[in-house]
C-alpha cells in the first residue's frame, strides 16, 4: 500500500526555490513535526521532474540499517559509492546529527561531486551546535 502524505505546499515551494543551488538545505524542527515527510515530498517532486531513481539517495540515519555509517568517513565512502551514475545527484539525509563529524562528510560531498544536498535534524542539536 502506497503511503499518502499531507501536502506542505508552502514549505515545498521554499525548498524548490533553492533546488540545484550550491547551498546545503537544512530543515529543522521539533520531533514529529513533518521534516521527513517534507523530504519525501521533495523526492516525489524530483521524480515528477523526471530525475532518475539512480540519482536520488534518501537515508534516515536513525534506521539500524545504517548503523555502520555513524562516523563521517564510512558515511562519506558509502555515499561516494552510490553516486556513480552520470548527472547531478540529490542527497537526502534525515537526522544527520547521528553521524559523528557529519559536517566534514557533507562539505566534502558538496565540494567533490555534482550534488544537491538536503538534511534534517532536531532543533535542539542545530541550535546548540557550531552551526548556529
Which residues does each PLM region occupy?
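Phosphate-binding site recognition
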Residues: 1-132
Amino acid at each position: 500500500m502506497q503511503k499518502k502524505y499531507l501536502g506542505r505546499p508552502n514549505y515545498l515551494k521554499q525548498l524548490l526555490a533553492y533546488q540545484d543551488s550550491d547551498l546545503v538545505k537544512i530543515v529543522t524542527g521539533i520531533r514529529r513535526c513533518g521534516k521527513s515527510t517534507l523530504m519525501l515530498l521533495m523526492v516525489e517532486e524530483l521524480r515528477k521532474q523526471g530525475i532518475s531513481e539512480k540519482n536520488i539517495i534518501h537515508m534516515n540515519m536513525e534506521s539500524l540499517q545504517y548503523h555502520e555509517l555513524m562516523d563521517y568517513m564510512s558515511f562519506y565512502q558509502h555515499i561516494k559509492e552510490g553516486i556513480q551514475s552520470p548527472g547531478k545527484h540529490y542527497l537526502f539525509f534525515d537526522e544527520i546529527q547521528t553521524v559523528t563529524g557529519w559536517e566534514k562528510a557533507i562539505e566534502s560531498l558538496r565540494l567533490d561531486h555534482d550534488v544537491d544536498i538536503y538534511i534534517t535534524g532536531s532543533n535542539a542539536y542545530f541550535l546548540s551546535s557550531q552551526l548556529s
